[in-house]
């Protein structure tokens, strides 16, 4: 039965996942509903799939098809009937790269982002799609245009290339911002924005979310 136990830390290192085929339809329906009600993407803790709905019926799901040594390999599926039926639309959205899905987000039926983090948490790559997930391309940020680094960068002897972890884009009107940090959990780094849905990115300064230091 289901027990209320705290997930052991090693779960992060060697994820055990249950293939979707073995999970009940009720469970799947429940997860889809949670994803529909969620503002962002929803991660199924049982099987590691990541689901996102742009509206009630139209959604996407990254499903784990293989896993090894803390990394997963995903395919991308789409529903147009609110999660009742799913169609595989992309067998390899991350172009052969394994990792842990960081997020999945669409802004209309065609334009969206997906993120794939390395198991160590030291790097993450954001991918963009303009055709509803049929193909993705990696976002390239112009690191050499960073004219300042975050407040503690000099103490840590960081250069721009030390910021390898791209956080999922934040939307503000027609502008999307990617914060770039040194590793998962860091509260400061540098950021880049795009006004053309991720085709070109511009350096937008350093940031620190550690309270009022240097703000």
Regions found by a protein language model. Name each.
Residues 1, 57-69, 110-118, 164, ...:
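Short beta-strand elements that form the blades of beta-propeller/WD-repeat-like
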Residues 1-25:
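Extended, non-transmembrane interaction/recognition domains
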Residues 17-39, 92-96, 141-158, 208-214:
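Surface-exposed loop and turn segments in beta-propeller and other repeat-based domains
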Residues 39-66:
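Beta-strand-rich domains and repeat architectures in extracellular enzymes and scaffolds
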